[in-house]
Curated annotation (Swiss-Prot):
Source organism of the structure: Arabidopsis thaliana
PANTHER family per the UniProt record, alphabetical: DNA MISMATCH REPAIR PROTEIN MLH, PMS, MUTL, MISMATCH REPAIR ENDONUCLEASE PMS2
Protein name: DNA mismatch repair protein PMS1
UniProt gene name: PMS1
Tissue expression notes: Expressed at very low levels in mature leaves. Detected in rapidly dividing tissues.
Protein task: Required for DNA mismatch repair (MMR), correcting base-base mismatches and insertion-deletion loops (IDLs) resulting from DNA replication, DNA damage or from recombination events between non-identical sequences during meiosis. Component of the MutLalpha heterodimer that forms a ternary complex with the MutS heterodimers, which initially recognize the DNA mismatches. This complex is thought to be responsible for directing the downstream MMR events, including strand discrimination, excision, and resynthesis.
Keywords: DNA damage, DNA repair, Nucleus
GO cellular component labels: mismatch repair complex; nucleus
Single annotated GO MF: ATP hydrolysis activity
Basic and acidic residues: compositionally biased ranges: 543-553, 565-581, 591-601
Record-stated family: Belongs to the DNA mismatch repair MutL/HexB family.
Compartments in which it is found: Nucleus
Gene Ontology biological process terms, A to Z: DNA recombination; fruit development; mismatch repair; pollen development; seed development
Location of region: Disordered: 543-603
NCBIfam families assigned: mutl
Amino acid sequence: MQGDSSPSPTTTSSPLIRPINRNVIHRICSGQVILDLSSAVKELVENSLDAGATSIEINLRDYGEDYFQVIDNGCGISPTNFKVLALKHHTSKLEDFTDLLNLTTYGFRGEALSSLCALGNLTVETRTKNEPVATLLTFDHSGLLTAEKKTARQIGTTVTVRKLFSNLPVRSKEFKRNIRKEYGKLVSLLNAYALIAKGVRFVCSNTTGKNPKSVVLNTQGRGSLKDNIITVFGISTFTSLQPVSICVSEDCRVEGFLSKPGQGTGRNLADRQYFFINGRPVDMPKVSKLVNELYKDTSSRKYPVTILDFIVPGGACDLNVTPDKRKVFFSDETSVIGSLREGLNEIYSSSNASYIVNRFEENSEQPDKAGVSSFQKKSNLLSEGIVLDVSSKTRLGEAIEKENPSLREVEIDNSSPMEKFKFEIKACGTKKGEGSLSVHDVTHLDKTPSKGLPQLNVTEKVTDASKDLSSRSSFAQSTLNTFVTMGKRKHENISTILSETPVLRNQTSSYRVEKSKFEVRALASRCLVEGDQLDDMVISKEDMTPSERDSELGNRISPGTQADNVERHEREHEKPIRFEEPTSDNTLTKGDVERVSEDNPRCSQPLRSVATVLDSPAQSTGPKMFSTLEFSFQNLRTRRLERLSRLQSTGYVSKCMNTPQPKKCFAAATLELSQPDDEERKARALAAATSELERLFRKEDFRRMQVLGQFNLGFIIAKLERDLFIVDQHAADEKFNFEHLARSTVLNQQPLLQPLNLELSPEEEVTVLMHMDIIRENGFLLEENPSAPPGKHFRLRAIPYSKNITFGVEDLKDLISTLGDNHGECSVASSYKTSKTDSICPSRVRAMLASRACRSSVMIGDPLRKNEMQKIVEHLADLESPWNCPHGRPTMRHLVDLTTLLTLPDDDNVNDDDDDDATISLA
């Protein structure tokens, strides 16, 4: 053709085949080895691990765009290897191809450093144990050594790469644009090595601009996979995992951790799934798909946390498939996947589910003791005639003599708005045999009135009943401005009696003080006042004039006894209690209690008596106002006996005394190990805590559940032994109807008047030939025409329908795609019909059945009788997978462990024989 300047094939000779320039080869091949930032750092980290390093530090500048370096404490590089260190295909780990069968190192090709030289500026700083100083090596882009320089460094190696991809313009621009994404991939990859490398400490940090170094990964180099998981992901993630050990064959096994079956253990993304072969991180998409689909059968749409290490002999797999060594071939993949599926089925069986135990959320004020037990013990003291001699002189216990001074905070808790107080109590010792005062002794008060404020009166008392001292916290009952009635509770009921005095244990109130104005010297630093001891203490300042108060006080104070005691204690005890004066007239109401935040367990020891003296450095400028204390122990004893009689008449006390009392709840879950380095102890404690904090629920347990009632016209409250569960009535009934429809629904087949020609890809045609029986079971009838052109070998002759819903070509292609994704023998997708066969259905078929089941189920807002609720719960026991409705909603949740509603005091001095004194009724 005229005007065509292109050479004719007949007149032009074929081009000559010439060798490619070495530099061009180097750059082309290097770009295939180092694909991104994560692959570059991966090669350096693997070199450090092969060198036996126990500490690896990765430092990046501007997320690796400027430079990145890997620092280790490995064996270092000997001077004889300096010149060949970065040459292509030079390695010390492989001599013959057969060595691949027994490979124990991460690297074996000798391409990493050579490729990094071609794509960036490489420097290496290294020292062995035989060298006195380190050497800094500089290489050019071809891998040749250009400079050596002596420098100071510990034994090990530091590899620095600057300006990665700088000599590849397109790759460099793409690298800079996605640098944050590349950095995220790198951190995820380092997590994999930090998990599997036992005894190796990893630190990864990044520095941006003039900002300080930011550490994103810091492990401790523990010696077990369990400890590495806790370090990298935290204890909360580890508690949701369970160990896995599956024997695939005689010489192959799988070990690691998987998310526990049940709700609340998975993740919304599959971002924490790590697979290893003999400790090498690899990609295993088929295993990942298998685990995900089995897990979703029990936990809705979540993805499990997966950490699995395949321990196989060297000849059972091929690692030399891709340049990054992430793709692996098994010699017998089918048997490996099949054996793994059988082992995972035992873990993610649809007949079991794990529920996180919900504790009873107590208020910030926790009961000091088990109410029934405390009440019974105090009542027994009174009923048996054990009466304390309140007028006798008693001595302080020896416990005060040995106690070291310590600071304590006494906090006032008031339900009504009032000013804030802060008391600073300093412990003081006393000599044995000194300082005895009667309980009836009235404290001396000398205070200067300010702005018409009433006087501050404090009276502290101690009971000698040793069994009431089981709590580690001390209670102080004090009064401000006036004495408070604690016993005139006209409308008290059983619940009030059983929770006498709440206490904040080991917590600090928000009440704070800046300085103190009054100084109180105390005989002792610890005191205990039970609420019942002040039942009859009723003093009102409106009922007495100041002169009457002075007269009453004068009658009660004997100058020959009380004044001497006061003077002696002022001389001997110099560690004060300071109060801050309120800024307004404040009066404690009924139930106001001082709470002592006490960390010293010795403070739970009983004291004999306490007298408190208040003294003010200021001189009195006005009339003194006092309140006297009227108290009769006989009246208190009578009141307590009457209360006990009322409870006995109702049968409440006898029922509690005849039922064993539960142990302290969640003791193992809150236990602090005294020997954190004891692995066996930690393992036992972790197992005990796990058993307390989760419940393994089996399908058969639905038949044993007792329905208690309906909540909010939408949920069923049921009890199983000591646990309460809440069941979603709509989701539970919907799942029952869904599985019933899946078993009973038959898809009818509608022949087409004119067959439809299908346009399928070659891969789809192969899938159709492999799974023709499953396609036919779903109602599609295909006709094959081998003489047709490629892509048109099949024609559709019939389509399925159900009632008014018809399925067509798009549903057939959806079914073919599902079958292709499951790769035949690896198929684990659940069937909409029954678990006996692995038949798969189009997504629209499942959606149709789910919609019908939803519309025919009990709705939220429907009132149900008890027998109807029991029927819904029992139906769940007959289902294949009763844990989620077809739309993913959980059918049941753990509500509360009933034993947490009543707990024993946290006291080591309580005998086990006392456990039978009280209980809680779970009925």
